[in-house]
Amino acid sequence: MYIRFQQIMAFFPVFSTSDIEKAFPIFDKKALVYWQKKHYLTKIRNGYYFFNTTQIEEGFLFFTANKIYNPSYISFECALSFYGIIPEGVFMMTSATSLKTTIFNTQIGKFQYKKIKSNLFFGYKIINLDKYSFKIAELEKVILDMLYLNESLDSIESFESLRWNKEELKKINFEKLSNYQLLFNSNALNKRVNHLMKYIYA
């Protein structure tokens, strides 16, 4: 049974019980418990699994973040690190979602999701890394996501304390940033963007 299961589900880097039921309409979920004890599978969170033969790479973690809480896309600190904006690595997968804010502590790391308004769920793209495809905020959108939900970024000094890479920030498409900014319709965000601009070109 397991060999057949593995052959079919190997097409899914991360699979849900719903994925399993589509492939195996009559499936005893007790098998999942048994296979975990045999170290064939690892449960990420309720209803989501991956095979223990999987190599845990960055692309896999990004893909997993999208899969286990959908709709969502990689954003905030994780995306800033991906684009080289922040100097240090991150130890938690951070995403934007239109669902409620939550966090999952799993055997492969922490996955944090921050709620944004449904009308702000845009500005992401699909890219490939380590053979995995996933949704990640565009550079301009991750900047706005970050500023929108961080009230403390209210001065040039607050950005200086973050040590964001100015040379990478200069790669921002400022026309796109401005267009996206209008969709937020937030005076507070506009002020934070102004502080960011002063920081970049100080």
Report residues per predicted region:
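Short beta-edge/loop segments at beta->alpha junctions of small alpha/beta modules
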Residues: 1-71
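Nucleic-acid-binding surface
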Residues: 18-19, 52-202
